């Protein structure tokens, strides 16, 4: 699991940098309380994808075993183990063609529950640089997710 732009497929690295620069420079986002953006994940190993996919599909103890096997150091509550966070084993993250980003508040903390307008603005800006945004997915919205459209 990586957070580095350099671990993305070379075809989308420049777009990732430009997207983050544009997000950080956007006055509408600044006025909404966004101080910056954190890359949560870029390229992902299959074991990590399988662990994510197990959530909501396996018993809590088995989900935790999947997380341990993937090397994910995260303590999950029983409720979290039963909450699906992906619908696929074929994520664009596996090929380095996706990244998850989250806004940061002025206190430096990730703003996972930012208002919808923040996520929609992020989507609009990112789409201008060639990304498809999970914000717009009807069946399973994934607000932090951006995947390269050229792939």
Outline where the language-model segments fall.
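Short loop/turn and capping residues at structural boundaries
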Residues: 41, 63, 136-138
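Mixed-charge, low-complexity intrinsically disordered segments
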Residues: 50-91
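Acidic helix-start/capping segments at beta-turn-to-alpha-helix junctions
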Residues: 35-54
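Catalytic cores and adjacent binding grooves of peptidoglycan-active enzymes
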Residues: 79-151
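Active-site acidic/histidine clusters and adjacent loop/turn architecture
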Residues: 1-41
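Short, charged/polar surface micro-motifs in flexible loops or helix N-caps
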Residues: 44-47, 57-59, 106-108
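Stable alpha-helical elements in mature extracytoplasmic
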Residues: 12-19, 48, 118, 122
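Short aromatic/hydrophobic-glycine micro-motifs
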Residues: 28, 34-35, 57, 130-134
């Amino acid at each position: 699991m990586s957070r580095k732009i350099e671990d993305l497929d070379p075809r989308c690295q420049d777009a990732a940098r430009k997207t983050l620069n544009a997000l950080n420079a956007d006055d509408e986002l600044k006025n909404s309380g966004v101080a910056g953006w954190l890359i949560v994940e870029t390229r992902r190993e299959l074991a990590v994808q399988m662990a994510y996919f197990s959530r909501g599909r396996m018993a809590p103890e088995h989900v935790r075993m999947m997380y341990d096997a993937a090397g994910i150091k995260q303590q999950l509550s029983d409720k979290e183990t039963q909450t699906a966070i992906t619908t696929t084993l074929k994520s664009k993250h596996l090929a380095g063609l996706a990244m998850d980003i989250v806004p940061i508040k002025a206190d430096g903390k990730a703003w996972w529950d930012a208002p919808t307008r923040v996520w929609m603005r992020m989507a609009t800006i990112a789409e201008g640089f060639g990304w498809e945004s999970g914000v717009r997915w009807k069946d399973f919205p994934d607000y932090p997710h951006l995947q390269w459209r050229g792939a």
